Every structure is written in structure tokens, then in C-alpha cells.
């Protein structure tokens, strides 16, 4: 997910996206713990996406 795509979304949409990403991260952590996760790079991708969304939420909050 690109930051330019996220910038067009509203704060509510970003919060929904953040919630979805956190759920995905939890699922990946459970898969990793049970040794079912084959592609471990997904963990870092989701973590970076969470950081992007949180950064944009913060930027929009500061602007208002």
C-alpha cells in the first residue's frame, strides 16, 4: 500500500484501515507462533503499513 493512496482517504477510513492491519498482524503473529507462516516478510510489510497509516492519521490531526 502506497502513502499516496492513503493520503486520499479520510481519517475515519484510515482508522478502519489501521484496525484491519492490526488484525492482520495479529493473525500473522499467531501463524508464526504455530509455525504455519511460510512467508515471514509479510510481518515487516504489515508493520510498515501500520506505521504509514499511523503517520498519516497524526499528520491529518496536526493539520486540523
From Swiss-Prot:
Q: Can you quote a single GO CC term?
A: cytosolic large ribosomal subunit
Q: Which keywords does this Swiss-Prot/TrEMBL entry list? A: Ribonucleoprotein, Ribosomal protein
Show the disulfide pairing.
none
Gene3D superfamilies on file = 1.10.287.310
One GO biological-process annotation of the entry reads:
translation
Single annotated GO MF: structural constituent of ribosome
- Span of the secretion signal? none
Q: Which HAMAP family match?
A: Ribosomal_uL29 (MF_00374)
Family per record: Belongs to the universal ribosomal protein uL29 family.
Protein name as catalogued? Large ribosomal subunit protein uL29
Q: By which gene is this protein encoded?
A: rpmC
Amino acid at each position: 500500500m502506497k502513502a499516496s493512496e492513503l493520503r486520499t482517504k479520510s481519517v475515519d477510513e484510515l482508522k478502519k484501515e489501521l484496525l484491519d492491519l492490526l488484525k492482520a498482524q495479529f493473525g500473522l503473529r499467531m501463524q508464526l507462533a504455530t509455525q504455519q507462516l511460510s512467508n515471514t516478510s509479510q510481518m515487516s510489510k504489515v508493520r510498515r503499513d501500520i506505521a504509514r497509516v499511523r503517520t498519516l492519521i497524526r499528520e491529518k490531526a496536526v493539520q486540523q
